[in-house]
Regions:
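Helix-enriched interaction subdomains in cytosolic or periplasmic regions
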Residues: 1-16, 66
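Catalytic cores of carbohydrate-active enzymes across secretory and cytosolic contexts
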Residues: 302, 327, 331-334, 339-436
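Glycine-rich beta-alpha loop elements in corrinoid/cobalamin-binding modules
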Residues: 77-223
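N-terminal [4Fe-4S]-dependent radical SAM core
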Residues: 10-40, 47-48, 205, 211-262
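Radical SAM [4Fe-4S] cluster-binding motif and immediate context
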Residues: 237-338, 342
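Secondary-structure transition/capping motifs at alpha-helix termini
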Residues: 65-66, 130-138, 182-185, 256, ...
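Short connector loops at secondary-structure junctions
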Residues: 67-88, 150-151, 360-368
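Flexible loop/turn segments at secondary-structure boundaries
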Residues: 47-50, 79-82, 115-117, 150-153, ...
C-alpha cells in the first residue's frame, strides 16, 4: 500500500485535501520496478482546472498504454498547501505514486495560457528542480513544455530543456525510445538533447541563439548546434479518428470545472478568424468518424459513471455529421439521465431537413438559491397566468437578469423560442436541494 506524501494532520488543515491524494477511479497504477521511463504530466493550475483538460487525459492514456512508461499527474498546489510545503520542505509529488517529481525522468508541462507562467516557476521551485535549464544535472528530470504557448516559447525558454511544438500524438514515442537508449549509457545530458533535437517537432532552446530588437521583438534566431534544425516543424495528426483517445478517463474525487464525458468531434476550424490563435494553430480541419464517436460515448459513460456528455471542438456547428450524432445521443440516452451539452443547438434549429420538434430542458443552478415563492404559488394555484417573463424561455426570475452564463449563451446562439423555431428551450434556473 502506497504512503501518502502528506501526513493526516496536513490533509485535515488544508482546503479540499482530495486534490492531493490520488487514487481516483481509472487512475493508472504500475510497479516502478517494471518500467523504464517515469513521466510526470503537469497542468500548472489547481486540480479542478487541470483535471478538466482533455489534452492531458489523451497523453496520460497514450503514455500509459506503453508497458515501459508510467505517466503520472501533478498540479499546482493551492495557496494553503504551498505555504505548508515550503515551511516543511516537502517536495512536490505525483498523485499516483506520491513520489517526488524530482525523481522522475521527465516533467512535462502543458502551457495553455500566458497567465500560468508564474505557476510554472512555482512547480519547478516546489519540485526542488533548478529553475534554469542550464543549471540542471544528470540527477534532474528533463523539463519539456507543450501546448499552444509553445508556438512562442522564447519568454520562458530558459526554464525548459525542450519544447514539443504541435499535437502530442505524433513524436512522443520516438522521444521516449530515444531516452531509453540514452538512459544508463553514460552519455551526457547534452548528448541526449542533441538526439532529441533531431526529432521533428522538438525545439531545444540551448541549441539556438536569439537576438532581440530594442522594442523586445525577435531580431534573429539561428541554431548553434549541428543537430538543431533551422526551422522546427509543428506536429499535426492528420487522422484524428485513429489517434489515441481515453476510453477510461480519470474520474475526480471532487467537483471539477468539466465534470463530464468529453467527445472531441473535430480539430481545426474553417472560419479563419485572424484574431483567433487556436483557429490558426490547429489547421487544417479534421473530423472524427461519427460511428467511432457513438462508440466512444457508450464506452466512456460506462467506464466513468458520468451523466453528461460534452461535444468539444473549436466550432461544433461546422461538424458535418452533427445532426446524426446529436440525434443519436438524444435518442440513445434520453431515458438514461444523460444531458447532451452542445454550444451549437442553433445548427439543428437552422437545419431545413429537421422534421422533428426538439424540446430542450436545461435544469442547472442559477443565481437563485431555490425556486421563488411566486413560481410555487403559480404551480399550486388553479389560476391561469398569461403574462410572460421578459425572456421567453426562462421559468422564473434570476437574481440578475442581465447576466447569467446559461442565459447569455442561449441569447448568443439565437435561441428565442420563436414560432418558426424547431428547437425550443426551457431554462429552469434553480438549485434543487432538500428545501425544494
Amino acid at each position: 500500500m502506497r504512503k501518502l506524501a502528506l501526513d493526516d494532520d496536513i490533509l485535515l488543515e488544508i482546503e479540499k485535501p482530495a486534490r492531493y491524494i490520488g487514487g481516483e477511479v481509472n487512475a493508472v497504477m504500475k510497479n516502478v520496478e517494471d518500467i523504464d521511463v517515469r513521466f510526470a504530466m503537469c497542468f500548472p493550475d489547481v486540480y479542478e482546472i487541470g483535471m478538466s483538460h482533455l489534452g492531458i487525459q489523451i497523453l496520460y492514456d497514450m503514455f500509459n498504454r506503453r508497458e515501459d512508461v508510467w505517466c503520472e499527474r501533478v498540479y499546482s498546489p493551492w495557496h494553503d498547501l504551498d505555504k505548508v510545503m515550503r515551511e516543511q520542505k516537502i517536495p512536490l509529488f505525483a498523485l499516483e505514486s506520491q513520489d517526488p517529481i524530482k525523481d522522475f525522468d521527465f516533467l512535462g508541462i502543458t502551457i495553455q495560457f500566458e497567465m500560468c507562467y508564474t505557476n510554472i516557476l512555482q512547480i519547478l521551485d516546489l519540485s526542488q528542480i533548478p529553475l534554469h535549464a542550464k543549471d540542471r544535472t544528470l540527477d534532474d528530470p528533463f523539463v519539456i513544455g507543450g501546448g499552444p504557448c509553445t508556438y512562442n516559447p522564447e519568454p520562458i525558454a530558459e526554464f525548459f530543456d525542450l519544447f514539443y511544438i504541435g499535437e502530442g500524438e505524433t513524436a512522443y514515442d520516438e522521444l521516449l525510445d530515444a531516452y531509453k537508449e540514452w538512459k544508463g549509457s553514460g552519455k551526457s545530458r547534452r548528448e541526449f538533447l542533441e538526439r532529441a533535437a533531431q526529432i521533428e517537432g522538438l525545439y531545444v532552446p540551448l541549441f539556438y541563439d536569439a537576438e532581440y530588437n530594442e522594442d523586445g521583438t525577435l531580431k534573429s534566431f539561428t541554431p548553434n548546434n549541428e543537430y538543431a534544425p533551422a526551422t522546427v516543424k509543428k506536429q499535426i495528426v492528420m487522422d484524428v479518428t485513429d489517434a489515441p483517445y481515453p476510453m477510461k478517463p480519470v474520474v475526480p474525487f471532487i467537483k471539477v470545472t468539466q465534470d463530464r464525458v468529453v467527445l472531441e468531434i473535430q480539430r481545426g476550424c474553417i472560419r479563419g478568424c485572424r484574431f483567433c490563435q487556436a483557429g490558426m494553430l490547429y489547421r487544417p480541419v479534421r473530423e472524427r468518424n461519427v460511428e467511432r464517436l457513438k462508440q466512444y460515448a457508450h464506452d466512456m459513460l460506462q467506464n466513468t459513471g458520468h451523466e453528461e456528455i460534452s461535444l468539444s471542438s473549436l466550432s461544433s456547428s461546422d461538424y458535418s455529421e452533427l445532426k446524426e450524432l446529436v440525434t443519436y445521443l438524444i435518442d440513445e440516452f434520453k431515458n438514461k439521465g444523460i444531458d447532451v451539452f452542445l454550444e451549437s443547438l442553433n445548427r439543428l434549429n437552422r437545419d431545413k431537413n429537421l422534421h422533428k420538434n426538439v424540446l430542450a430542458f436545461i435544469n442547472v443552478p442559477g443565481w437563485v438559491g431555490d425556486p421563488r415563492e411566486d413560481l410555487q404559488e403559480r404551480l399550486k394555484s388553479k389560476k391561469s397566468f398569461d403574462t410572460p417573463l421578459e425572456v421567453p424561455f426562462i421559468t422564473h426570475w434570476l437574481h440578475n437578469m442581465t447576466h447569467d452564463q446559461v442565459l447569455d449563451m442561449l441569447k448568443y446562439l439565437g435561441m428565442g423560442n420563436r414560432p418558426e423555431d424547431k428547437v425550443k428551450v426551457i431554462f429552469v434556473p434553480c438549485y434543487l436541494d432538500g428545501r425544494d
